[in-house]
Amino acid sequence: MLKTKVAVQVISPGMLPDDAIMLGDAYLRQWKIPQGQPLTLKFGAMRQYVKVVPVERFDGMRIGQSLARKMGLLANTTLRIRYRPEEAQLALGPLIGVLISRDDPEQRDRPFGSITMFCKELVDACEAQGAYVYFFTPLHLKGNYNTVEGWVYSDGWRKTLLPSPDVVNNRLTSRKLENRPNVQEFIQEVKIRHRSTVFNEKFLDKPEVFEALAKDPSLIKYLPESHVLKSFPMLKTMCSRYHTVFLKPVRGSLGKGIIRITKMEADAYSAQYATVGGTRRHYFSSLLKLYGSISGKMKTVRYQIQQGLQLIDIMGRPVDFRALVQKNETGKWVLTSIVARTAGSHHFVSNLARGGTLSTVREAVGRSNLSGSSSSEAPGKLQRAALDIAHGVDNFIPAHFGELGIDLALDTSGRVWLLEVNSKPSKNDNTPLQDQKIRPSVRNMIRYARHLAEF
């Protein structure tokens, strides 16, 4: 298999037969492409038999307007080209499709709302690496999965019809959208019919992650005791073991709906609720009365009950860490970034949506109440934990992931704990602490897509 980058030019009608392409003769000589014999030209799911016309002193590809339109190829695009002699196939790509939650055609400058800049970063990264990306929503999936109507960027955002992609990056931000029949049908069809790869193909529930990772003895050290809360006896047992426990919605995000339960004097308990404006606290004379106050919520919200941890803090504000791990150009997990998140005043969760602030790991650890010897070891321990956990997710959860947001914590003895694994990490939450045009996380995403598509 041979591959390189090539500039694709679309030429006027009549200059080239519809079943022919022009290619620099150096490619034909180097790759021993037979002249006069038809090849299969591939772009995403689209395939077309073509004859190759060699052109001297030319290092690009020329394709007629009619064939380019049929293949979904845009003019003046630099792509990677791959030749497989055993299949007599010339492929252009990779063609990457990003499945997003919604679009707004009326907002031409910001058709994807708050993630528009992230989408433009992907476009720029693809241009630099010789890939092509488009964006589509569940509403664009109409049943013919050979082609998809999607958004492309060429001097502005516009919609066009494109082949189904080589690689799909699932960036849907709601389980309701992800579970739509047309989305699930599309994912299965492109994987089976077109041999496309879909990564980050599903959301992760908290109990699913903890139960899976507990199968690996080497990962148990990172796992606070956790269970799905089903009854009062379970709450009573956990509260007898730990001074503080947390109730977290199984399918929650951004710190929404978390309840911290703390044992007070005698048999009294306090329950603190995370809200946008701060923490709301209620007191109960018994654990049974506290349970009665949440049992109504439990009819509609499943909770994970988790061991409370004595986390490091800065002036009483808890600190945790968000690691972004991604697969690289060889398919191996690497740590792309890790940042510290310090809870806002009057909050016990650190999410930015709840007033948290970002800093580097070393800065946060250095300002925290962690002892000096543990503090110097903390960055390395956090990095190792993030990669260990990513491998565990790969090994024990039957789904394909290319990036994970892993929330970690340090207790006051310097031990690393897992809080949560997110298969759809928010791009805002992972904003680097330095300003760059294209984030490393975006470059890595394209490199991994190239690896999957073998470009």
Indicate where each model-derived feature is located:
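Glycine-rich phosphate/pyrophosphate-binding beta-alpha loops
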Residues: 341-349, 422-431
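A long amphipathic alpha-helix within ATP-dependent nucleotide-binding catalytic cores
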Residues: 285-409, 440-455
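Short beta-strand segments enriched in small/hydrophobic residues
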Residues: 93-104
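A short beta-strand motif that forms the metal-chelation/ATP-contact edge
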Residues: 322, 408-423
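Conserved N-proximal alpha/beta basic substrate-recognition cap immediately N-terminal to
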Residues: 110-234
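Redox-cofactor binding/interface segments in oxidoreductases and associated redox assembly factors
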Residues: 98, 169-170, 247
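Active-site nucleotide/adenylate-binding loops and adjacent lid/helix of ATP-dependent enzymes
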Residues: 2-22, 29-38, 186-193, 197-306
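Short beta-strand-centered segments at strand-helix junctions
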Residues: 2-92
